[in-house]
Amino acid sequence: MVTDTSIDSRTARLGVNMVVFEDYSKGAITVATQKREWIIPFNGHIVDVICDSEGVGGNNSQADIIDVNLNGVTIYTTQGNRPSLPQNNTGLFAEAGEPEVTALRVGDTLSYDVDQVDSTGSTRFKITIICQTL
């Protein structure tokens, strides 16, 4: 497993104010909404969304695309900014831009969807949502 130095650097910078939500899927990811949900127990904001895959999915022409939702609405109001992994690839998903909706309040629901996969989704998929408390 690859160590993500971006998480390490944020830990050093944010310290005790950092909260991390994570999920892992060993098998091929499939298109679905609300793959995992978390109830937010603090006021704060989203710092970053990091997605990673160690196993290649299909070999068609589609990227694997992930979306993160806050109370059922995407945090990526610019859809092209969602984390994506080109077909037949592994490693960190690229983001064209950071999420536009980042404010978190006690009781909010944070979730992620798999919006699109190649013929077979990536395997050994990990998502890390890094937040900072106020």
Task: Describe every region a protein language model picked out.
Residues 23, 33-69, 110-113, 126-132:
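Beta-rich globular "head" domains
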Residues 116-120:
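Short, charged beta-turn/beta-strand-edge "cap" motif at the junction between a beta-strand
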Residues 1-9, 42-45, 63, 98-105, ...:
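Surface-exposed receptor/substrate recognition regions of extracellular proteins
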Residues 54-106:
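Terminal beta-strand-rich extracellular "head" domains
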Residues 11-14, 37, 83, 106, ...:
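Positively charged, low-complexity intrinsically disordered regions
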Residues 1-30, 47, 69, 73-88, ...:
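Glycine-rich, low-complexity segments
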Residues 24-28, 35-38, 98-102:
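Beta-strand-rich interaction surfaces with strong enrichment in secreted/lumenal proteins
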Residues 6, 32, 38, 93-96:
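Short, functionally important structural connectors and interaction interfaces within domains
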